[in-house]
């Protein structure tokens, strides 16, 4: 059960980082 919780936290952290980078780089992509 603990493994499932740690996996969920890991995926959640990766998604947060991904969206943070994606939204941060979006203005530059749109300017191109």
Curated annotation (Swiss-Prot):
Biological processes annotated in GO: photosynthesis
Bilayer topology: Single-pass membrane protein
Keywords: Chloroplast, Membrane, Photosynthesis, Photosystem II, Plastid, Thylakoid, Transmembrane, Transmembrane helix
TM helices/strands, residue ranges: 3-23
Localization: Plastid, Chloroplast thylakoid membrane
Cellular component terms per the entry's GO annotation: chloroplast thylakoid membrane; photosystem II reaction center
Entry annotated with the keyword Ion transport: no
Family: Belongs to the PsbT family.
Function per UniProt: Found at the monomer-monomer interface of the photosystem II (PS II) dimer, plays a role in assembly and dimerization of PSII. PSII is a light-driven water plastoquinone oxidoreductase, using light energy to abstract electrons from H(2)O, generating a proton gradient subsequently used for ATP formation.
Subunit field text: PSII is composed of 1 copy each of membrane proteins PsbA, PsbB, PsbC, PsbD, PsbE, PsbF, PsbH, PsbI, PsbJ, PsbK, PsbL, PsbM, PsbT, PsbX, PsbY, PsbZ, Psb30/Ycf12, at least 3 peripheral proteins of the oxygen-evolving complex and a large number of cofactors. It forms dimeric complexes.
Name of this chain's protein: Photosystem II reaction center protein T
